[in-house]
Amino acid sequence: MVILLQFYKEENFKKTEIGEIPEDWEVRELKDILEVIRNGLTAKQNKDKIGYPITRIETISDSKIDITKLGYVEDIKQEDIAKYRLIIGDILFSHINSEEHIGKVAIYEGKPEFLLHGMNLLLLRPNKNKIEPYYLLYLLRHFKQKNIFKYIAKRAVNQSSINQTQLKHLKIPLPPLEEQKQIAKILSDFDNLIGTINKQIEVLNKAKKGMMKKLFTKGVFEHKSFKKSEIGEIPEDWEVVELGNEKYFKIIMGQSPPSSSYNKEGEGVPFLQGKAEFGNIYPNPVLYTNKPLKVVDDEDILISVRAPVGDVNIAPFKLCIGRGLAGIKSNKEKVDNFFVFYYLSYIKPKIEYLGGGAVFKAITKKDLESIKIPLPPLEEQKAIAKRLKAIDDLIEIKRKEKEQIEKAKKKIMNLLLTGKIRVKT
């Protein structure tokens, strides 16, 4: 509510070449509000951290400057250092990239303290007397969301590009400078809040990982004696079983029904081809089929058997599974599905490297059957799963909170950057 009190609805608009904008806004070309627009330094780079840090195309792949994705240059002239060193407020723009990444932007905020501008990213240096750098950052992100950069890009095989001339003549809405700063602050506040939630999720995931390591080796009950096993030391009363042990498990490999049977109208059985619709625990299928071939039931385990392999979910109801998935049914008198679900997610890295240590694009039924899991008594399985489910519930609450904030930010950003709502300055 505090943020909403800063807004008022605009009533007076004028027609322009980019659509309706408030009467006191301008339309300017990008070149008119920049001090510099240019490509980066062409130089031989290394990843051994020898020399000066320099940006690479992947440095901004997550729409921020990622200091773990930098290159380094050794031989460089002093005049090039002066020319290509980034200053706070510089914006990097991805103008040569796949269609998915074209138009991504990131702003330099001073970390690392010394950073050179490398090739395959354009530098946009705002004239701070005309435009607030963060306003321009959010405006360019807004344009990307609206697919403007996809529209103006020149397409080639696996790559798109936008030349400097096109970008220089890109027309942008320009509010008064003080309003730009207010818009940028509001959107930055949203980003800071999202960043805080991301850190909370990161802490919870780290705690979950540590909890898993302890629970799957020491258990949840007090154990006084332990034994060595093929998967490491475990409590004396635990077993080690393979997923291929029919006393405990049954594996169903997915098979895709005819594509003519697919629909989104809810006819037949919900259908999953692969892990695309996987959630944190449960999937959210969008397709249905009226000709199911391979079916799993409520609470059966789902595992991805095609790249990326090893991801797991729990079936929330009866589902048809395609060839990208397998289902694991458990003997419920001996096995708690959620315990197995959590253990498989814990050993996902090992599942990815099944067979000689190489990453496989697919795993077979035989591979799945060979996976060994610890099996405590059923009561302890349930207790372990309950503890892990509790922390997962906290993570899910945070994810939903983040999702709601992101939706609110997107809506408000659209209203602010089109002038439909204004900021009181």
Swiss-Prot record:
Transmembrane segments: none
GO molecular function: DNA binding
InterPro entries assigned: Restrct_endonuc_typeI_TRD, Restrct_endonuc_typeI_TRD_sf, Type-I_RS_S_subunit
One of the GO BP terms on file: DNA restriction-modification system
Top-level lineage group: Archaea
SUPFAM superfamilies: DNA methylase specificity domain
Functional summary from the UniProt entry: A putative specificity (S) subunit of a type I restriction enzyme thought to recognize 5'-TAGN(6)TGC-3'; the other subunits are unknown.
Family under the similarity heading: Belongs to the type-I restriction system S methylase family.
UniProt protein name: Putative type I restriction enzyme MjaX specificity subunit
Biological source species: Methanocaldococcus jannaschii (strain ATCC 43067 / DSM 2661 / JAL-1 / JCM 10045 / NBRC 100440) (Methanococcus jannaschii)
